[in-house]
């Protein structure tokens, strides 16, 4: 629900009200309804745009939610120029003097103004978001609607006020519109009955619009003006009955309406609520009407109680003060009831919007509360983690502090030990001073000896270099001898292989010779046989004759014998030839045997010579190696002696290194 705040409005016109700009006033519940243009300015076009953000005002006067100020639905009414206050008014186009104000209305106006100012000084009332239920126990503060901003009334099936009243009746306020209900009919009647009953009621507001302020109509004024009777061409006005009695009417065809009084402000009227403004204006105007009627006395006539009469009623007697006051109070009561009904209707109309806004605001507060709660929880967790981290750091720093204290104590102990040791070393240094001088003299002597030994060492190194060069030359000679030995050994192996081949050939020749001997024996035996046969056949041969037919018939034996004699001659020639070859082979074998034996003897001599040379080289190498080892041992011994002397001079002892000697034994190839 929206929080209602009212602003004070003085009854008397302020001197600066005509020049100072009017600040925008916060609208009431009914002023939130869009679509009602201001009568003071041009009617805005009807459009359904997105509603502006609603804002709420708490009792402390602070705006919550970060919403900006809402733009007013209607532009502010410019200040009206001050109208000179006159002491006369026009009622039914007749000049009337100013009627005396009603004492009861002035007292009530003053009391309501004081109550209104006291209410403005206090905190604004609280509205709960429940339909039709207002908060109780609010220190007895009445909840009243704020002044509505100038808007045009919505058409509700009845013609508007300017259609009845003409161009001069456009400035009627809510309180002046309520006079129509006061003099035209009861407020509780429906719109249909009021329109039908007021169809024949002529209205003539001649001097009314000129004396009215050019302010704005409140909600109750709009509702009152919407219930005006329609214009009728008939001359009679129906009389309506009210609970309090008859309402007077002035004239036979026109309603008498009083003019403005001296105390009415001429600027724009911003009342606290439609109810209070209409009550005050109705009371004051009622008193003035009563004064005007009593003053004139000739134009006032009561309405007829019969609604069906069309003829003008006779002029009534002048009404009394009590009747007028009773009518005024009844009009006030009807205005209050109408305003209360209007407020209830407006609250019912805006209930959904206000409840939705309140729920949205409540959800926004819940979201803010959840966000704040989460932020608080996160901050608490961060603070807890930071506290734990700080505690851990404090614990680590305490441990480091204890460790540093232990290290400091240990360093102090080490410092004391080092100080004691330094004192001991200083004492020993003072004691060893004379001995150091003696040691210096000995070192000088030893340095001279060392220089001599170094000179001897250089000489021995030169000899060693010479011996090394000789050793290198011997090694080169040894390599050459070994190469020659390898060559001679190769040659010997070749000769041995050749000798073996010759021996094999000799054996083969001997075997062949033996075979030839056996063949020769066989041939000898055959030759003996052939000799014997030849001896038997040495008879002189018969010279061949002419072909004897008897030779053709020679036997086979003769043919064999004659062939054997030819074969024996050929065999003898072959045997002789073989004998010559055998002798020649024997001579060649003997020559080869002699050459083989000579080569074997030469190879044996060369072998013995190489072996002797190799043994001599090996012996020389062994002697050189031994001499080198001996020289190395001497050099090492000298260096050890020098080092021992130096260490002895410095007062240190060192173990002598163990020297391992190798044994070299000669081997026979």
From Swiss-Prot:
Residues 284-295 have a biased composition (Gly residues). It is found in: Cytoplasm; Cytoplasm, Cytoskeleton, Microtubule organizing center, Centrosome. Residues 450-669 are annotated as: Sufficient for interaction with KATNB1 and for inhibition of katanin-mediated microtubule severing. Residues 1-56, 92-131, 150-201, 215-323 are annotated as: Disordered. Residues 328-649 form a coiled coil. A motif (Nuclear export signal) lies at residues 631-640. Residues 172-181, 215-233, 298-308 have a biased composition (Polar residues). Changing residue 291 to R: In a breast cancer sample; somatic mutation. GO terms for biological process: fibroblast proliferation; microtubule severing; mitotic cytokinesis; negative regulation of canonical Wnt signaling pathway; negative regulation of fibroblast proliferation; negative regulation of protein localization to nucleus; nuclear export; primary ureteric bud growth. Induction: By inhibition of NF-kappa-B signaling. Changing residue 638 to A: Induces nuclear accumulation. Impairs nuclear exclusion of beta-catenin. Residues 1-25, 187-199, 241-251, 267-283 have a biased composition (Low complexity). The modification Phosphoserine is found at residues 249, 296, 570. Highly expressed in prostate and testis, and at slightly lower levels in spleen, thymus, uterus, small intestine and colon. Residues 447-669 are annotated as: Sufficient for interaction with CTNNB1. Interacts with KATNB1. Also interacts with CTNNB1, gamma-tubulin and KIF23. Negative regulator of katanin-mediated microtubule severing and release from the centrosome. Required for central spindle formation and the completion of cytokinesis. May negatively regulate axonal outgrowth by preventing the formation of microtubule bundles that are necessary for transport within the elongating axon. Negative regulator of the Wnt signaling pathway. Represses beta-catenin-mediated transcriptional activation by promoting the nuclear exclusion of beta-catenin. Belongs to the LZTS2 family. This is Leucine zipper putative tumor suppressor 2. The gene is LZTS2.
């Amino acid at each position: 629900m929206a929080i209602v705040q009212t602003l004070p409005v003085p009854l008397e016109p302020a001197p600066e009200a005509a020049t100072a700009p009017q600040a925008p006033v916060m609208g009431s519940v009914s002023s939130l309804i869009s679509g009602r243009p201001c009568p003071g300015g041009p009617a805005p076009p009807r459009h359904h745009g997105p509603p502006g953000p609603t804002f709420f005002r708490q009792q402390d006067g602070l705006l919550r939610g970060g919403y900006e100020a809402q733009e007013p639905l209607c532009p502010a009414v410019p200040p009206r120029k001050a109208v000179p206050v006159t002491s006369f008014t026009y009622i039914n186009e007749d000049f009337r003097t100013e009627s005396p104000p009603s004492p009861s209305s002035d007292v009530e106006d003053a009391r309501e103004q004081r109550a209104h100012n006291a209410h403005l000084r206090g905190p604004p009332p609280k509205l709960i978001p429940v339909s039709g239920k207002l908060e109780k126990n609010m220190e007895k503060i009445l909840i009243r609607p704020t002044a509505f901003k100038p808007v045009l009334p919505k058409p509700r099936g009845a013609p508007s006020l300017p259609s009845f009243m003409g161009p001069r009746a456009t400035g009627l306020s809510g309180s002046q519109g309520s006079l129509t209900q006061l003099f035209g009919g009861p407020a509780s009647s429906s719109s249909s009955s009021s329109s039908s009953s007021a169809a024949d009621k002529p209205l003539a507001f001649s001097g009314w619009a000129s004396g009215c302020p050019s302010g704005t109509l409140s909600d109750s004024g709009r509702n009152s003006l919407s219930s005006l009777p329609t214009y009728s061409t008939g001359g009679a006005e129906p009389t309506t009955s009210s609970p309090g009695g008859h309402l007077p009417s002035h004239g036979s065809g026109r309603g008498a309406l009083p003019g403005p009084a001296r105390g009415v402000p001429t600027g724009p009227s911003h009342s606290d609520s439609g109810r209070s403004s209409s009550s005050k204006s109705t009371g004051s105007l009622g008193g003035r009407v009563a004064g005007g009627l009593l003053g004139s006395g000739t134009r006032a006539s009561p309405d007829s109680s019969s609604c069906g009469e069309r003829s003008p009623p006779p002029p009534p007697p002048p009404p009394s003060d009590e009747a007028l006051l009773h009518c005024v109070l009844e009009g006030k009561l009807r205005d209050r009831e109408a305003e209360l009904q209007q407020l209830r209707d407006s609250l019912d109309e805006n209930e959904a919007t206000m409840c939705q806004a309140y729920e949205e605001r409540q959800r926004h507060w819940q979201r803010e509360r959840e966000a704040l709660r989460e932020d608080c929880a996160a901050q608490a967790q961060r603070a807890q983690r930071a506290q734990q981290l700080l505690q851990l750091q404090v614990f680590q720093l305490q441990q480091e502090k204890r460790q540093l204290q232990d290290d400091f104590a240990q360093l102090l102990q080490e410092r004391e030990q080092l100080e004691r040791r330094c004192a001991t070393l200083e004492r020993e240094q003072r004691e060893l001073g004379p001995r150091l001088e003696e040691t210096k003299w000995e070192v000088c002597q030893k340095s001279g000896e060392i220089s001599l030994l170094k000179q001897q060492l250089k000489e021995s190194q030169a000899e060693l270099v010479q011996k090394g060069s000789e050793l290198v030359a011997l090694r080169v000679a040894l390599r050459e001898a070994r190469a020659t030995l390898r060559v001679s050994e190769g040659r010997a192996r070749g000769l041995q292989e050749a000798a073996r081949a010759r021996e094999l050939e000799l054996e083969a020749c001997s075997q062949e010779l033996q075979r030839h001997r056996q063949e020769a024996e066989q041939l000898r035996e055959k030759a003996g046989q052939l000799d014997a046969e030849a001896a038997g056949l040495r008879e002189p041969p018969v010279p061949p004759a002419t072909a004897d037919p008897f030779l053709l018939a020679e036997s086979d034996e003769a043919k064999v014998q004659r062939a054997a004699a030819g074969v024996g001659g050929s065999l003898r020639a072959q045997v002789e030839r073989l004998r010559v070859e055998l002798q020649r082979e024997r001579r060649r074998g003997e020559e080869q045997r002699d050459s083989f034996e000579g080569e074997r003897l030469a190879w044996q001599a060369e072998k013995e010579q190489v072996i002797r040379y190799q043994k001599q080289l090996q012996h020389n190498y062994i002697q050189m190696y031994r001499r080198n080892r001996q020289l190395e041992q001497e050099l090492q011994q000298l260096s050890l002696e020098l080092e021992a002397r130096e260490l002895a001079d410095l007062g240190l002892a060192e173990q002598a290194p163990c020297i391992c000697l190798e044994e070299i034994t000669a081997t026979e190839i």
